[in-house]
C-alpha cells in the first residue's frame, strides 16, 4: 500500500519530467524569464502589447501558471498561423469567463473547434449573415441613423456637449437589437437604452478577467477562485447579462407575438429548433445555443462597432486637415442640401473609405483578436509550438510595425492612396477582423454599420472639442478604445 501511495504522489512529477525531457529537444520560442510554478504571471502588468516583440522577436513564448501562450507580432508569423496552419491553430482555449459568457461554449466565437462549432458556423453563414439578410436590414440601419441625426441636431442648436460613448453605444445597440432580436431598444420594457454601454462593460469584465483556475487547472485553482471570492464576483457580473438575454428569449417565445415576414436572427434559430424536432437531425440546437448566439451578436456586434466609431471621431478631431478633406469629398459628392442620406450614398467616396481603413489599422477593436489554441504540434517561423498552446495574434503591433508602415503611429489615410491592402483577412499586415476559419462572421454587417454611421456624422455635423480641452491629450490607453467622452458639434 505504501509503495502504491508513493507512486501516486510521484506520478505527476514523473509526467512533468518526461514532458520537459520531450520538449527539451524542441526549439521553443524565446520569451521573458519565468519563475517556477507561476511562470510569467508576476510580469503580467509589465508586458504592454507593443513592446513584447522589441526584445524577443515576433514569436514569443509566455507561461501563465501551467498555460503556455505564444504571442505573434509579425505579418509573416501571422500568415503562418492564420493561413498555412489555420486548421492546426483554429481551436479556442476554455477559460472560466468565456465558458460562462458562451453558455458552456454553445456559441460561435468562443467554442472549441469541432463538429458542434462547424454546425454553428454553417448556420451563421447559410442562415444568419447572408447577403439577402444584410440587404433586408438596410432600412433598419438607415432609420436608426436618422434618429441619431435628429437627436444630434437638437444638441447642436444649443451647442450642448455630446457624450460620444453613450451616444454611439446606443446607436449601435439599437441597430443590433432590431436586426438580431427584433425589438426596438427605444421602446423596450426590460432595458433602458442608456444601459447598453454598461452591459457591454460587464461583458468585457467576463471576457478579460482571468480566474486562477484558468492558469492552474484542477482543485488548487478552483479552491483559490472560491476562497478569493472570484467565483461570486463573476456570477454577480454575469447575472445582469443573463437576465437581459433571457428577456430577449422570453420576448421571442411570447404567445401571440407577431413575427415579421423576414424574421430577425433569433427567430431564424428558433424556427430551426422546431424543424429539427420534426426532422430528427443529429445536431440539436438548444436554449443554450440560442443564448450563446444572443451573447455573440450583442456583445461582439455592439462593442466593436461602437468603439471603432469613437476612435474615428477622436482621430478626426485630432487631425483637422483630414477631417476637412474627407468632409469636402462627402459634401461635394453628395451635395450639401440632402435632408437624409442612404447606404447607396456610400458609393464613390474614395477618400472616405481610406479614412475608415486607417481607423481599422490604428485602432483594431480587438487588439489581440480572440485567442486561438493549437490542436497539434506545429512549427511557426522555425519554432516548435506544442499542442494545447494558446496563440494570440498582436494585430495592434503588426499594424504599427515600422517595417510595414511609414510613420506607423501617424493617422494618415493617404498611405492607402496607391495601396491594394484591404482589411478583409487576405492581407496579413491589416487584420482587424481576423482571418481563416475564425474570421469574424459578422464582418460585412460591422463594416457597413461603421461606414454608414460615420458618413452621417461627417455629412451633417462639424466636430470640435469643449473649451479648454486639448486635442493632443484626448487619447490614452494601449490599443483599447477609450477615446473622447465629450465633443461639440455644430
From Swiss-Prot:
Regions crossing the membrane: 1-21
Gene Ontology CC, one term: plasmodesma
EC class name: oxidoreductase
Tree of life domain: Eukaryota
Localization annotation: Membrane
Alphabetic keyword roster: Heme, Iron, Membrane, Metal-binding, Monooxygenase, Oxidoreductase, Transmembrane, Transmembrane helix
CDD domains per UniProt: CYP71-like (cd11072)
Positions bound to heme: 440
Gene3D superfamilies reported in the protein's UniProt record: Cytochrome P450
Family matches, as SUPFAM superfamilies: Cytochrome P450
UniProt GO molecular function: heme binding; iron ion binding; monooxygenase activity; oxidoreductase activity, acting on paired donors, with incorporation or reduction of molecular oxygen
Membrane topology: Single-pass membrane protein
One Pfam family from the record: p450
Record bears the keyword Transferase: no
Cofactor(s) required, per the database record: heme
InterPro entries found in the cross-reference section: Cyt_P450, Cyt_P450_CS, Cyt_P450_E_grp-I, Cyt_P450_sf, Cytochrome_P450_71
Principal cellular location given in the protein's record: membrane
Record-listed E.C. numbers: 1.14.-.-
Family statement drawn from the similarity comment of this UniProt entry: Belongs to the cytochrome P450 family.
Protein name listed in UniProt: Cytochrome P450 71B29
Species this protein is from: Arabidopsis thaliana (Mouse-ear cress)
Upper classification of the organism: Eukaryota, Viridiplantae, Streptophyta, Embryophyta, Tracheophyta
Amino acid at each position: 500500500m505504501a509503495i502504491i501511495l508513493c507512486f501516486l504522489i510521484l506520478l505527476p512529477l514523473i509526467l512533468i519530467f518526461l514532458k520537459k525531457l520531450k520538449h527539451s529537444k524542441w526549439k521553443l520560442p524565446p520569451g521573458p524569464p519565468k519563475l517556477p510554478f507561476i511562470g510569467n504571471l508576476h510580469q503580467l502588468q509589465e508586458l504592454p502589447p507593443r513592446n513584447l516583440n522589441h526584445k524577443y522577436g515576433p514569436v514569443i513564448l509566455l507561461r501563465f501558471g501551467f498555460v503556455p501562450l505564444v504571442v505573434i507580432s509579425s505579418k509573416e508569423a501571422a500568415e503562418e498561423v492564420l493561413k498555412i496552419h489555420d486548421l492546426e491553430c483554429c481551436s479556442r482555449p476554455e477559460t472560466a469567463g468565456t465558458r460562462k459568457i458562451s453558455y458552456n461554449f454553445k456559441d460561435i466565437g468562443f467554442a472549441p473547434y469541432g463538429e458542434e462549432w462547424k454546425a454553428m458556423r454553417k448556420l451563421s453563414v447559410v442562415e444568419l449573415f447572408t447577403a439577402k439578410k444584410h440587404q433586408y436590414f438596410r432600412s433598419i440601419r438607415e432609420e436608426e441613423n436618422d434618429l441619431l441625426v435628429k437627436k444630434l441636431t437638437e444638441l447642436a442648436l444649443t451647442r450642448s456637449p455630446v457624450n460620444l460613448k453613450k451616444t454611439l453605444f446606443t446607436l449601435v445597440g439599437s441597430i443590433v437589437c432590431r436586426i438580431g432580436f427584433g425589438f426596438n431598444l427605444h421602446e423596450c420594457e426590460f432595458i433602458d437604452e442608456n444601459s447598453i454601454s454598461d452591459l457591454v462593460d460587464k461583458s468585457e469584465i467576463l471576457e478579460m478577467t482571468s480566474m486562477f483556475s484558468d492558469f492552474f487547472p484542477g482543485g488548487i485553482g478552483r479552491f483559490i477562485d472560491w476562497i478569493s471570492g472570484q467565483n461570486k464576483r463573476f456570477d454577480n457580473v454575469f447575472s445582469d447579462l443573463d437576465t437581459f438575454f433571457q428577456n430577449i428569449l422570453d420576448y421571442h417565445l411570447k404567445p401571440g407575438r407577431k413575427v415579421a415576414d423576414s424574421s430577425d436572427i433569433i427567430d431564424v434559430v428558433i424556427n430551426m429548433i422546431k424543424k429539427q424536432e420534426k426532422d430528427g437531425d443529429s445536431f440539436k440546437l438548444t436554449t443554450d445555443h440560442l443564448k450563446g448566439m444572443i451573447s455573440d451578436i450583442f456583445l461582439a456586434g455592439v462593442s466593436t462597432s461602437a468603439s471603432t466609431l469613437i476612435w474615428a471621431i477622436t482621430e478626426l478631431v485630432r487631425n483637422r486637415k483630414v477631417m476637412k478633406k474627407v468632409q469636402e469629398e462627402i459634401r461635394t459628392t453628395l451635395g450639401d442640401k440632402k435632408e437624409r442620406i442612404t447606404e447607396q450614398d456610400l458609393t464613390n467616396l474614395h477618400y472616405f473609405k481610406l479614412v475608415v481603413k486607417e481607423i481599422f489599422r490604428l485602432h483594431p477593436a480587438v487588439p489581440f483578436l480572440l485567442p486561438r489554441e493549437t490542436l497539434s504540434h506545429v512549427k511557426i517561423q522555425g519554432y516548435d509550438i506544442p499542442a494545447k498552446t494558446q496563440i494570440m495574434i498582436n494585430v495592434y503591433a503588426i499594424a504599427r510595425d515600422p517595417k510595414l508602415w511609414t510613420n506607423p503611429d501617424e493617422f494618415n489615410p493617404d498611405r492607402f492612396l496607391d495601396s491594394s491592402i484591404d482589411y478583409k483577412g487576405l492581407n496579413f499586415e491589416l487584420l482587424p477582423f481576423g482571418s481563416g476559419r475564425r474570421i469574424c462572421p459578422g464582418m460585412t454587417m460591422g463594416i457597413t454599420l461603421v461606414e454608414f454611421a460615420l458618413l452621417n456624422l461627417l455629412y451633417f455635423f462639424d466636430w470640435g472639442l469643449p473649451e479648454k480641452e486639448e486635442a493632443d491629450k484626448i487619447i490614452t490607453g494601449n490599443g483599447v478604445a477609450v477615446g473622447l467622452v465629450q465633443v461639440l458639434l455644430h
